């Protein structure tokens, strides 16, 4: 698995170095390309160049693919490739997949992989369609690409955005601070993607029969609800005096 991650990161860095990957059509230093590739695959969102203004459409596509691979997991991506190529998945590969997603048993791994892929692309598609009206309103036809990019980035919890411009410093989603649609869609994508595939497998399989959920799913759902609700209420309480104080 480690070698797989390293290989994907290195390949991504080499591609991002190419002039076609930048808006200025110049070579990117290896350390900058390597940092960007690592950040994308490991879905950290840290950048040394603004993603929206520095990278070309090709470069942004490479970054998005790296984010998607990182979000799915290298092993999941590899198993997906084997499935699409029609090859049989060996017991060793099934065991690697089991370890990668913390599945309780090896049996049903192929079914679970299909569920992961279908679920991922379905949620990302719905997210992109929901964001489409806003981004197309503001950016025209380019809004289609922006909706897709931010939907995938949010679902994979990657933190990358392409809203930056050469004359501004990393604005991210600050322009949409008062837009409820963008805020709600991005938040839901982050939560759905962050909960994990096994938890959603439980939700889709057992519905409201919570007692049938895996212990892991119960802990994740409870912890997610608490860690979202308590800080949100705390921030509302802390910011309330500030909003009431008149500005001199």
Each language-model region and where it sits:
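Membrane-proximal intracellular helices of multi-pass ion channels
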Residues: 1-248
């Amino acid at each position: 698995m480690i070698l797989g991650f390293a290989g994907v990161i290195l390949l991504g860095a080499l591609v991002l170095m190419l002039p076609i990957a930048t808006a200025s059509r110049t070579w990117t230093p290896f350390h900058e390309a390597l940092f960007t590739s690592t950040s994308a695959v490991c879905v950290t969102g840290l950048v040394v160049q603004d993603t929206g203004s520095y990278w070309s459409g090709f470069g942004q596509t490479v970054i998005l693919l790296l984010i998607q691979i990182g979000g799915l997991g290298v092993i999941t991506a590899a198993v997906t490739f084997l499935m699409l190529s029609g090859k049989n998945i060996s017991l060793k590969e099934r065991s690697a997949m089991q370890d990668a997603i913390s599945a309780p048993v090896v049996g049903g791994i192929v079914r679970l992989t299909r569920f992961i892929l279908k679920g991922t692309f379905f949620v990302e598609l719905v997210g992109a369609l929901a964001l489409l009206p806003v981004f197309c309103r503001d950016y025209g036809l380019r809004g289609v690409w922006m909706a897709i990019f931010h939907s995938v980035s949010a679902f994979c919890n990657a933190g990358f955005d392409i809203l930056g411009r050469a004359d501004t410093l990393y604005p991210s989603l600050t322009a949409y601070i008062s837009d409820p649609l963008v805020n709600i869609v991005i938040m839901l994508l982050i939560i759905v993607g962050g909960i994990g595939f096994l938890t959603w497998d439980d939700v889709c399989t057992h519905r409201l029969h919570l007692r049938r959920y895996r212990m892991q799913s119960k802990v994740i759902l409870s912890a997610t609800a608490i860690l979202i609700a308590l800080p949100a209420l705390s921030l509302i309480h802390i910011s309330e005096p500030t909003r009431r104080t008149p500005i001199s």
